[in-house]
């Protein structure tokens, strides 16, 4: 489904070059639940950004369903991000003045889905993460764990093939972290 072949990522920093990734080879199959571990600054987020199409590799190839991305155009990357990938970030990235429901619907608004279908899909995603009774709340009225579940629902609403979660429990207490990881594990089975 997804393969990284000899991926390198080099950043220029002033006069210096930083090798963020050097020769990464990985394969992911459908329904794999994978954790990428390592010390701070070792390239984990860079690799997730490359897999998610948010950043581009310097050398190597990212192969999606047997197709090389070397010749991907902007519209190919846009389609990949909008329809194949769901992102969950440590800092939630929720819009404070919008309700929980509106925050989840936003992902579908960008994909051109009708208002009725957006609402139906967003409610289903929020139900999947145990927040169907919180639709009208604003993010400021929720705990960190609840906000992370909203972020997970937003990642799920497009029914993506791949969920990329970058330190999804980093800002949460131990008990809530376990709950969030259980939700992510359950999602990977579907």
List where the protein language model places each region:
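ABC family nucleotide-binding domain
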Residues: 1-190
């Amino acid at each position: 489904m997804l393969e990284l072949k000899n991926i390198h990522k080099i950043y220029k920093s002033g006069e210096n070059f930083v090798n963020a990734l050097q020769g990464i080879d990985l394969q992911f199959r459908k329904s794999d639940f994978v954790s990428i571990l390592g010390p701070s600054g070792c390239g984990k987020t860079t690799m997730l950004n490359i897999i998610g199409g948010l950043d581009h590799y310097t050398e190597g190839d990212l192969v999606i369903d047997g197709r090389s991305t070397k010749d991907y155009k902007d519209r190919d990357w846009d389609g990949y991000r909008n329809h194949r990938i769901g992102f969950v970030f440590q800092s939630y990235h929720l819009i404070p003045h919008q309700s929980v429901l509106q925050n989840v619907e936003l992902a579908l608004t960008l994909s051109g889905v009708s208002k009725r279908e957006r609402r139906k899909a967003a409610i289903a995603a929020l139900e999947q993460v145990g927040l169907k009774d919180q639709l009208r709340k604003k993010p400021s009225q929720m705990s960190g764990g609840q906000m992370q579940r909203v972020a997970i629902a937003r990642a799920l609403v497009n029914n993506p093939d791949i969920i990329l979660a970058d330190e999804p429990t980093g800002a949460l207490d131990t008990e809530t972290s376990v709950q969030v990881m259980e939700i992510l594990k359950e999602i990977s089975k579907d």
